[in-house]
């Protein structure tokens, strides 16, 4: 009798994806983040579902309904803070995952990489719309400022913004549609993630050395299931420390003030995980230029495979490229810090320099370093 795990039409798919999957024997902890992202997505969908049972998407009651969840619903406070801080953990894992892909040259799997970029955009859109839902001051003004950026599009900008708003300002129609989109997008993300995995399993995983590992594969279970559980424990511990000891550490105090269209907060800023892109947006004085830079700061990932000049796949044996990679990481941290600062001297200048360095590292310095390393190795 054949094993049901290998013969059943449905269980067979799961078996080929998570149990008998041949995986390289040398992949490090940096390969944990894919499974952690899956766990984060499941956590967000479950906590979000329970929050949606009590939330009302009406401008008059949205803020009160969130307060009601925290005060009156059984364990509502922990569900709300797991959802809010779960988003932060999601983005930490997401940026680590993308960073690992860049460092080890995983972008050479072009289909997997491009779907990953689509996933990144979709997750960012979902997180932005979720931030609007509590209808606090920062929710309202963040929605107003970010949606207003679309008015920079020539000819159709103003009409497009009013179409998204459902009126002449951010109001009830905007909140209702944002809630609807925020609810449906995680399921679209799940479908995209399945396609992402499908394409990855067509080629098999990359590994730190960057060379083919077909001759040295081991089954995913039990080796990497156990390894992933370690990463999961670290993730859960970090998340619970955040939720139980300082749940508002990564939030904005202004969001505990109900939305008021007549009173602008002194510093409008998004959640911490968007600050780097926000800093790039603010570093360009022209509105359309800023919007283009904002979109390109993520879209630049799509042309990284084209700009790969090195004859080696990853950066494991390329010290010059390693230096540039960590320079890029430091630059992104600088941009994140600048994004949270007021628009005044010296932050404006630092932001502009960091933005120039971000694009020049990715588009100019990294391809040049690949060529130099090839020459040094006489390739």
Curated annotation (Swiss-Prot):
Sites where the protein binds a ubiquinone: 201
Protein's GO biological process: mitochondrial electron transport, ubiquinol to cytochrome c
Keyword field: Electron transport, Heme, Iron, Membrane, Metal-binding, Mitochondrion, Mitochondrion inner membrane, Respiratory chain, Transmembrane, Transmembrane helix, Transport, Ubiquinone
Binding positions for heme b b566 per the UniProt entry: 97, 196
Cross-referenced InterPro entries: Cyt_b/b6_C, Cyt_b/b6_C_sf, Cyt_b/b6_N, Cytb/b6-like_sf, Cytochrome_b, Cytochrome_b_C_euk/bac, Cytochrome_b_N_euk/bac, Di-haem_cyt_TM
Membrane-spanning intervals of the chain: 33-53, 77-98, 113-133, 178-198, 226-246, 288-308, 320-340, 347-367
Main localization (coarse): mitochondrion
Name of the protein described by the UniProt record: Cytochrome b
């Amino acid at each position: 009798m054949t094993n049901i795990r290998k013969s059943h039409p449905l269980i067979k798919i799961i078996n080929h994806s998570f149990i008998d999957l041949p995986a390289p024997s040398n992949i490090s902890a940096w390969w944990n983040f894919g499974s952690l992202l899956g766990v984060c997505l499941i956590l967000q969908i479950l906590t979000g579902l329970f929050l949606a049972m009590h939330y009302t998407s009406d401008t008059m009651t949205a803020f009160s309904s969130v307060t009601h969840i925290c005060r009156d619903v059984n364990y509502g406070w922990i569900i709300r803070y797991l959802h809010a801080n779960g988003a932060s953990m999601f983005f930490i894992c997401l940026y680590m995952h993308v960073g690992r892909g860049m460092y080890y040259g995983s972008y050479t799997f072009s289909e997997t990489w491009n779907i990953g970029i689509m996933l990144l955009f979709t997750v960012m859109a979902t997180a932005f719309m979720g931030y609007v839902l509590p209808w606090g001051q920062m929710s309202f003004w963040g929605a107003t400022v970010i949606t207003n950026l679309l008015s920079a599009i020539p000819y159709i900008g103003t009409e497009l913004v009013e179409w998204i708003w459902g009126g002449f300002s951010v109001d009830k129609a905007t909140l209702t549609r944002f809630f609807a989109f925020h609810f449906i997008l995680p399921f679209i993300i799940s479908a995209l993630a399945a396609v992402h995995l499908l394409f990855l399993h067509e080629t098999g995983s990359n590994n730190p050395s960057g060379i083919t590992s077909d001759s040295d594969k081991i089954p995913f279970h039990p080796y990497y299931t156990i390894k992933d559980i370690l990463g999961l424990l670290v993730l859960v511990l970090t998340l619970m420390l955040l939720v139980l000891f300082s749940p508002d550490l990564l939030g904005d105090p202004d969001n505990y003030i109900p939305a008021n269209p007549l009173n602008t907060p002194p510093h409008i800023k998004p959640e911490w995980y968007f600050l780097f892109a926000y800093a790039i947006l603010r570093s360009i004085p022209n509105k359309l230029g800023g919007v283009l830079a904002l979109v390109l700061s993520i879209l630049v990932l799509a042309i990284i495979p084209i700009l790969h000049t090195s004859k080696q796949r990853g950066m494991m044996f390329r010290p010059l490229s390693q230096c540039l990679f960590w320079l890029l990481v430091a630059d992104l941290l600088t941009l994140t810090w600048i994004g949270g600062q007021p628009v005044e001297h010296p932050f404006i200048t630092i932001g502009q320099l960091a933005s120039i360095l971000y694009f020049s590292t990715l588009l100019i310095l990294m391809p040049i370093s690949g060529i130099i390393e090839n020459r040094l190795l006489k390739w």
